[in-house]
Curated annotation (Swiss-Prot):
Keywords: Cytoplasm, Cytoplasmic vesicle, ER-Golgi transport, Golgi apparatus, Membrane, Phosphoprotein, Protein transport, Transport, Ubl conjugation
Bridged cysteine pairs (disulfide): none
Protein's UniProt name: Coatomer subunit epsilon
GO process annotations (BP): endoplasmic reticulum to Golgi vesicle-mediated transport; intra-Golgi vesicle-mediated transport; protein localization to axon; protein transport; retrograde vesicle-mediated transport, Golgi to endoplasmic reticulum
Compartment list: Cytoplasm; Golgi apparatus membrane; Cytoplasmic vesicle, COPI-coated vesicle membrane
Homology family: Belongs to the COPE family.
Organism encoding this protein: Homo sapiens (Human)
Pfam families named in the record: Coatomer_E
Protein topology in the membrane: Peripheral membrane protein
InterPro entries: Coatomer_esu (IPR006822), TPR-like_helical_dom_sf (IPR011990)
Amino acid sequence: MAPPAPGPASGGSGEVDELFDVKNAFYIGSYQQCINEAQRVKLSSPERDVERDVFLYRAYLAQRKFGVVLDEIKPSSAPELQAVRMFADYLAHESRRDSIVAELDREMSRSVDVTNTTFLLMAASIYLHDQNPDAALRALHQGDSLECTAMTVQILLKLDRLDLARKELKRMQDLDEDATLTQLATAWVSLATGGEKLQDAYYIFQEMADKCSPTLLLLNGQAACHMAQGRWEAAEGLLQEALDKDSGYPETLVNLIVLSQHLGKPPEVTNRYLSQLKDAHRSHPFIKEYQAKENDFDRLVLQYAPSA
């Protein structure tokens, strides 16, 4: 049975979240829609204006438009926006990443404003990019928002800690079972669980794609469900649709590399996707791991090469 479709969330007071459409678009990966909604929505308080701008600039980051964020967020901007700018600075300037992480380490060692959820999320995002999931989890653990918990679920699944991810998901379900983030986290955990749960995950991704839009995130989620069930041809159709939307999206390219191998495609097809991934995302974990394996192989070849 399909999950309930995302709908306007209301708090305990019964008030509809003014930013529901902005947040929902961001969470499902519809970044341009998020930007459009953020520029259109009229809000009731300066605090909501800041929250809207956080999602607006995070959507620009997701589109790799780092300059927009760096140019528009000023030193006088709210602390939440400064946190987004810090992540933009990290993503835009590879040569400055070590110093940005060192400064972040110093901030985290002091008293952190745990009510600034955006800072915790941006700190965790930087640590995750820096291949330090433990530090990312420590940052997220200080927050109690649904988004902090959803990101915790993602990281735990990357670490193959399905047991802990399930506990975090239970917390999300107790807090708001129908929230978009909770539904997505349910799909991620179901995908990692496998077996009969794969169909549950597929239904969640499909329902969101039908009700909202088939974003790259949702298409790759559906494709991953098919791949886990050995339905390679069905997965290929979804991945081609994703590729048509954005030929440089890393998850699509990684999934196509895996799929091409399983379908026995010619080596040049796989190599083409690999080259696209290297061109657009040379620091992607998949590329780093692939290059490490290549180097290991080259060392083995030299080790067993006949001596002159």
